[in-house]
Structure formats: structure tokens, C-alpha cells
Amino acid sequence: MNWKPFFDSLGMNGTRWQWRMTRWERNLRNLTRHGTLPDGSSLNATYIILAINLLWFALMIVKGGAAGHGLTTLMRPDGNLLVDFGGQVWYPLVTVYGEWWRCLTYAYTHAGLIHLGFNMIVLYQVGPLIEKEIGTPRFVTLYTLTALTATLLGLFWHPAVLVVGASGSVFGLIGFAVAYYHRMGRAGEALRNFMLRWALFAFVFGWIVGADNAGHLGGALGGAAFGLLLPISVRGQRASALLFIVLAIGSAAATVVSLGWQIGTWFR
């Protein structure tokens, strides 16, 4: 994939980052080809999450265009539109008005094409790797849980600030992978280091665009805790299989209900 135009648009050295991204993609393919990852997962959840994010953003562009905002919606949608599409503001929207669904909908709402593009690039790169490692039910649970831990830290850090984006969950995936693969010792060292490089890349990008560091930290801590607690042994994974199927169904249902509830507010 040609990453150069994307990084050039951010004022970064596109040629250098193109080389880095190509090298990381090659390393990831080598890791999976050499059998470091177990087989057996269909990887469906990652791409479903990607599709939901893209569809939700497309709906926002259409709604913003219909409201007369034009192309500004594509690159920098205004705050009211972000709130209409589930942006999170703890005070007053959640704590006073009880709009609890925003604790999940914010993670599917993005403040422009660059914001969406970055989060989807990272999800596309690391999501299939983690889903293949731990299975779809655990992956869905992890993704949803870290969206919640990301926004919960924001409650204490900046309760009155509008927050949007999947980066809390993305950092959650990275935090999980670093902790989980670190527990594997030398067998997981290459994958742990791969994820650490992604963490550095994500942090630098977030610093450049002034992203929500509280959400990043909350997601990463939630993911790391998940990675430290999740059983590594086959026996432990089998013992918890039913639990995570139930949790995944609950997570998916909560996400669908939250997005549906947000859509319902458009007609009130």
C-alpha cells in the first residue's frame, strides 16, 4: 500500500514513513508465515468493526452535507455534528442527561478523514494479528472493554471535553499485545517489539495532532490488564471459552443498541 501521500498530508516525511510501514508489513507477514500465530480464526470481527466505522463516518458526511456544511465535514466536522453522531461529553450529556450510549458510540465517531484514516490503518494492521491469536470472542470483548476504560479515564481527566475516535480501543489492542506477548518470553518477543513500534508511532501521531492522551492511556491500561489476566495455556483458554462467548455477545449487543439509540435521537 502507498502510505506516502497520507504522511505527506500530515507534514511528515512521506518517503521515510513509507519505508517504515512497508518494513513493518513485511515483518508481520514473516511472523505469520513462520507459524508464530496459531490458525483457526476467521478474522471477521476486525473487518466488521472497520466497516462500521467507515459507514458511520459516511453517514456523518451525508448528514453534514445536507445541513450545508459542505466539504468541511470531510476534514473537520463541527462539534455539534460530532455530538449528533455520538461524541462523548461526560458532563453534562452523560452525568446529567443520562446519555449512557455515548460511552460506546464515541469510539465509532471521528473528527475528520485524517483522524479516521489513522485509526483504521492501525486497526487494519494490528487487529487481525490479535484476533487470530486470541479468537473472535475475546477480541470483541477486548475491543469493547478498552473503549470503556478509555472513556472512563476521561471522566476524571476532562469530564467536560468532547471526545471522539477509536484510538482508545486501538491503544487498548496495542497495550494488550505488549503485555500478552511479553508473558510468552522469547516466543513472543518479536511480536511484542512489533507492537511497541506501533505504540511509538501512534503516540507520535497523537502528539502531532493533539489527540486525547487520557483516552489513549485509559485504553492502553485496560488492554494491558486484559493481556496480563487472559490465560495463555490452551487449557486455560478452553476453560474460559464459554465466558468470552457470552461477553462477546453482550459487547456486540451493547454496541448495536448504543448506535441504534444514537440514531433514534435524530428523530426526536
Protein language model features and the residues they cover:
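A detector for small-residue-rich transmembrane helices and their helix-helix packing motifs
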Residues: N2-R268
